């Protein structure tokens, strides 16, 4: 098996020596699981990395702690930014920030508020909203000529039903500022709309949109000063909405090597258009799009962050690079010096245990190791005795196996 950090060491971008040192505020440097790797990326590029989150420092993963030069716990960081940001300013004192980074969806707007309060360059609050509010997002893209699903915004049960009549069936109901496929429902008639409404009482605003029947892909980028420096095409098998509603499925995310294939050409072109229309400047983006049976390509949604569920690891395995450090170079210096050679298809297969309770045995793993050998990049399964996770509330379920092949 391949150690993603060791594998990428010789490809890690050298820290820039001809520019002044950078000081970066990293929001949630230890969570989700990939964040310590992004924190490390900033550090190896020569930045002084300061961390802030709502949890105590001792709970941070060791990798994150090792690459931080300071950490502030702000319990109200996400619940009351108006109170938390002045506390952050007092803690910083005379220190000046060059960048504010957050690669976790719930913190994208927060990061923009901190930038504006402290006068730090980067994505503004208005720009961030176009990546968080699906209505604003689709309005901007439709005006720019991008094919988006027909949709309507709803805040009450009555508005949801009215929107359903306007959009037509089948349709999707999902949070206006959600992430992934959580709290997302397909409805084929008014009765199913009522069932969805009963489960969405904790969501203030929803998007009711046309259901696009097709295969689902991603278009992910690292941008620097408005330039797309790196892009990635991913493929979900099956589409997440199906995987989220069928427990027996082992969901797969495929990193597709043949980025010039006609199968994905229109989606790639759409992705480039979306970045241009939204005026994205610097950082990671994660876009989802659909290809219908008749070949039509339809936009899904886009986020100003990397994909989750270890997909950046997939990108690294596919090209033997370190995109955690590559992203950091773009963020800090506006450059991207990694050489990208698309060597492999790579896939992450998520596993769900059978039954309830604790993991009692793992079947078939030895056969997989014997059969696939060097094609296995990583195996991360819950150890025996561990309680099974709630498969509906986690993307990685009870663990995963990552493979690659030319």
Predicted feature descriptions by range:
Residues 191, 210-280, 284, 291, ...:
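ATP-dependent carboxylate/phosphate-activation module, predominantly the ATP-grasp catalytic core
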Residues 1-7, 11, 25, 49, ...:
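Peripheral (often C-terminal) accessory segments that flank ATP-dependent C-N-forming ligase machineries
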Residues 185, 210, 255-256, 316, ...:
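Short, well-ordered beta-strand elements within core beta-sheets of diverse protein domains
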Residues 63-65, 175-177, 247, 391-397:
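Short, flexible turn/loop "capping" segments at secondary-structure junctions
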Residues 1-126, 158, 336, 384-387, ...:
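ATP-binding N-terminal substructure of ATP-dependent carboxylate-amine bond-forming enzymes
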Residues 281-287, 337-342:
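Flexible, glycine/charged-enriched surface loops at secondary-structure junctions
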Residues 133-214, 224-227, 253-269, 273:
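Active-site nucleotide/adenylate-binding loops and adjacent lid/helix of ATP-dependent enzymes
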Residues 36-43, 138, 161, 197, ...:
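Short amphipathic alpha-helical segments and helix-helix/interface helices
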